[in-house]
């Protein structure tokens, strides 16, 4: 990460936005995964986000910038996502809220929490190839908008939270899920 930080600083004179989008959803469905599995998921989803924030925070404090974490609706509600993954994504939201309170007004810290996002090569693409009818039924029964989010919709939300139009927003988690969490929050 320090190598990446050095490259970023040498390329741009001012860095005022850092988006922390790290981790993966690969895990197991066990209620309580093994220690080895837990550590692997925790490290790839939470610890990597924490270390990225820690590495780039001095730059953002200097520029009075924005730190945006990408979490998941799995960090907000139990939807059947793996326990270790959900826990790590919840921890990201808690980290961001605490950082936002302590860093305001110099650095804004927010989170986006996407729901189901479709893109070629993604996990939903593979599931659709296996059983499109089943996936269609899952989406129609769980997402009031009856569709997947697009990567562009997630990107647009990130751009907004990092823009001057969101200058008074810090410590927030923007849920982008087509209404999937409407009845559970």
Question: Can you annotate each of these PLM segments?
Answer:
Residues 77, 158-159, 170-185:
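Short C-terminal tail/terminal secondary-structure segment
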Residues 29-42, 139:
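Substrate-binding pocket helix/loop in short-chain dehydrogenase/reductase
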Residues 33, 78-86, 98-99:
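Active-site loop-to-helix junction immediately N-terminal to the catalytic Tyr of the SDR YXXXK motif
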Residues 115-142, 153, 183-185:
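A glycine/serine/threonine-rich, flexible loop-to-helix segment
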Residues 104-108, 169-171:
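Short, small/polar-rich loop/turn modules that mediate ligand/substrate recognition or access, typified
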């Amino acid at each position: 990460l320090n190598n990446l930080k050095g490259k970023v600083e040498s390329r741009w004179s001012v860095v005022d936005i850092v988006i922390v989008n790290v981790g993966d959803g690969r895990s197991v469905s066990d209620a309580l995964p093994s220690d080895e599995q837990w550590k692997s998921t925790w490290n790839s989803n939470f610890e990597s986000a924490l270390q990225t924030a820690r590495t780039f925070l001095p730059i953002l404090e200097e520029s009075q910038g924005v730190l945006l974490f990408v979490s998941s609706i799995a960090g907000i509600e139990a939807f059947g996502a793996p326990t270790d993954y959900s826990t790590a994504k919840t921890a990201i939201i808690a980290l961001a809220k605490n950082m936002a309170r302590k860093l305001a007004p110099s650095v804004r810290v927010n989170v986006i929490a996407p729901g189901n996002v479709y893109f070629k090569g993604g996990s939903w693409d593979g599931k659709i190839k296996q059983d499109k009818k089943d996936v269609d039924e899952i989406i129609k029964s769980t997402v009031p908008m009856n569709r997947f989010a697009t990567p562009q919709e997630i990107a647009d939300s990130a751009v907004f939270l990092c823009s001057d139009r969101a200058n008074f927003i810090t410590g927030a988690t923007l849920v982008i899920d087509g209404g999937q969490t409407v009845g559970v929050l």
